[in-house]
């Protein structure tokens, strides 16, 4: 669908209402009207179909097996045990008996059919969770450093992020009328949208809050990133980064991934003003003609960073202060038990590609249900698709450990290679309509194929960051990985190499459109050289750059590599 068509749909939607009520009530098809397929994204859902069944249904002269993905808005991925049980029940009753933790700390339900879509939405809201603005050309789910219970400063960070998420919600009542049966009032369909305006944003907008020295949110991959400045356990404010983004288009030199620019420091008091100024600047300056060039990163590159920063400061009425020093050490999760400053404990469990389901080998859904039934602590989703069981007293650890062992919830933590423990993948096939190749379903197989090579060179316990994406949109943030597979066609991938373990450097195309056999053949000699010639503590991506095997990619984003002067 063209940019002009989507802009027309948004502008004529009566503030995201469209004909959704009529589409939902139509019993003759499992699909929505075409324009409503665009609008339902703003309500937190995508219309999809099971691509594994497409050809067979076509032969039977049946319409595709339409279904819906629903995504929650859960800033920072924080939920209570009771909410977990309610989401578990929804997955079992309405979806495909699984919960999917996303790379933005949300949950996704897959396989919901149209006639049960409204009931599913109502059940999610009954859990005091919503899906509003989880998709669409608005601010998406706000990422936050994974565990706000580690310290008072982390708690303040989460509070700021949750406040900003609420501030940037659309003002329309369409969501509540369509899904929760709120009665229409005078002026419905004409509500003022003070932040978004009648056409909302040109494209999606992503925000992340990071707490050095850990960059688990990959803050520089966001349109807007906030890097916490914490001194003596007090959150003073944030370094502000703008213009990150992962999406690109295969073979199109006018599109590229980008890491964000640090533009200065703000105090906590200025968070809402600066965020509003940045979002409205993108609203007014972003490209609404060519959708593939509509993200904030292109607005910055087209108009110039100085121009955009000047506009932001003028709108906010704020002069940005010089950025404060910071250090990122890694962008992964710390598995196992960690003690917080309040002497409560937090257990991080690795989930392969974020999927929580019951299988013969790993009854993960049942296991987390058993922990939630204890009614203690909290659940925290991480930006690396893992789960933290947080806020556990010392006396409760043994009970948690027993359930972890009983249900094999630490299977991911015990994966045979460090690479497998830290790897990420997007959903891709069979539900994502954009997928060109497998990702989530392929990740375990690829890990198995790579394991003998890692063991051969003594690298099984060496952290190497692998990410797989089914298409170049990059939902698994593959362009920051040391090794990335980006889907090109069924069974074929672009092999990207040379990112780092701090989320600060993009990788480079190494081999294009190759098969698994070719991927493994390309990686083996490089891993062998890495084993022989790496420096102490040197990551794989850093090694590839130091030895000249990989250079920075040719697109303009690397004008914006993070300045070493800010690395304290």
From Swiss-Prot:
Gene3D superfamilies: Sulfite Reductase Hemoprotein, domain 1. InterPro entries: CysI, NiRdtase/SiRdtase_haem-b_fer, Nit/Sulf_reduc_fer-like_dom_sf, NO2/SO3_Rdtase_4Fe4S_dom, NO2/SO3_Rdtase_4Fe4S_prot, NO2/SO3_Rdtase_4Fe4S_sf, NO2/SO3_Rdtase_FeS/sirohaem_BS. Pfam families: NIR_SIR, NIR_SIR_ferr. Transmembrane segments: none annotated. The keyword S-adenosyl-L-methionine does not apply. It catalyses: hydrogen sulfide + 3 NADP(+) + 3 H2O = sulfite + 3 NADPH + 4 H(+). One of its GO terms (biological process) is hydrogen sulfide biosynthetic process. Component of the sulfite reductase complex that catalyzes the 6-electron reduction of sulfite to sulfide. This is one of several activities required for the biosynthesis of L-cysteine from sulfate. This is Sulfite reductase [NADPH] hemoprotein beta-component. It comes from Xylella fastidiosa (strain 9a5c).
């Amino acid at each position: 669908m063209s940019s002009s068509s989507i802009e027309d749909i948004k502008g004529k939607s009566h503030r995201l209402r469209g004909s959704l009520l009529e589409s939902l009530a139509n019993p003759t098809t499992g699909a929505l009207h075409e324009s409503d397929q665009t609008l339902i994204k703003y309500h937190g859902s995508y219309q999809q179909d099971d691509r594994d069944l497409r050809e067979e249904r076509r032969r039977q002269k049946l319409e595709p097996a339409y279904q819906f993905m629903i995504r929650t808005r859960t800033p920072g991925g924080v939920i209570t045990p009771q909410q977990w049980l309610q989401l578990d029940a929804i997955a079992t009753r309405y979806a495909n008996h699984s919960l999917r933790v996303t790379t933005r700390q949300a949950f996704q339900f897959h396989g919901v059919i149209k006639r049960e879509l409204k009931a599913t939405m109502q059940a999610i809201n009954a859990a005091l969770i919503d899906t509003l603005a989880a998709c669409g050309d608005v601010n998406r789910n706000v990422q936050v450093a994974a565990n706000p219970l580690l310290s008072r400063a982390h708690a303040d960070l989460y509070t700021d992020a949750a406040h900003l998420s609420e501030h940037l919600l659309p003002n329309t009542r369409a969501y509540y009328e369509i899904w929760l049966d709120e009665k229409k009032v005078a002026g419905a369909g004409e509500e003022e949208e003070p932040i978004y305006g009648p056409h909302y944003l040109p494209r999606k907008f992503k925000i992340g809050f990071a707490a050095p020295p850990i960059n688990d949110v990959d803050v520089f991959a966001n349109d807007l990133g906030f890097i916490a400045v914490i001194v003596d356990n007090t959150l003073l404010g944030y370094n502000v980064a703008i213009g990150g983004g992962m999406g690109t288009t295969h073979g199109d030199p006018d599109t590229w991934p980008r890491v964000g620019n640090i533009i200065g420091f703000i105090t906590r008091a200025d968070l809402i003003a600066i965020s509003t100024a940045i979002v409205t600047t993108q609203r007014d300056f972003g490209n609404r003609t060519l959708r593939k060039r509509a993200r904030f990163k292109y607005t910055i590159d087209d108009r110039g960073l100085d121009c955009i920063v000047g506009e932001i400061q003028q709108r906010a009425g704020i002069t940005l202060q010089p950025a404060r020093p910071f250090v990122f050490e890694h962008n992964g999760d710390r598995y196992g038990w960690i003690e917080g400053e309040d002497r409560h404990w937090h257990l991080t469990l690795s989930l392969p590609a974020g999927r929580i389901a019951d299988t013969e080998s790993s009854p993960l859904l049942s296991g987390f249900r058993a922990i939630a039934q204890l009614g203690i602590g909290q659940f925290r989703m991480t930006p690396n698709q893992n789960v933290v069981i947080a806020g556990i007293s010392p006396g409760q650890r043994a009970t948690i450990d027993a359930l972890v062992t009983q249900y094999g919830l630490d299977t991911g933590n015990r994966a045979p290679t460090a690479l497998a423990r830290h790897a990420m993948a997007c959903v891709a096939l069979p539900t994502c309509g954009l997928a060109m190749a497998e990702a989530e379903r392929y990740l375990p197989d690829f890990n198995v194929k790579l394991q003998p090579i890692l063991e051969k060179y003594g690298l099984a316990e060496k952290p190497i960051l692998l990410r797989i994406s089914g298409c170049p949109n990059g939902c698994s943030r593959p362009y920051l990985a040391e090794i990335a597979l980006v889907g090109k066609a069924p069974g074929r991938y672009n092999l990207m190499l040379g990112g780092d373990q701090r989320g600060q450097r993009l990788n480079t195309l190494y081999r294009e459109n190759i098969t698994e056999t070719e991927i493994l053949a390309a990686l083996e000699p490089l891993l062998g050289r890495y084993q022989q010639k790496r420096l102490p503590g040197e990551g794989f991506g850093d090694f590839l750059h130091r030895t000249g095997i990989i250079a920075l990619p040719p697109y303009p984003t690397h004008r914006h590599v993070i300045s070493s002067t800010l690395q304290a």
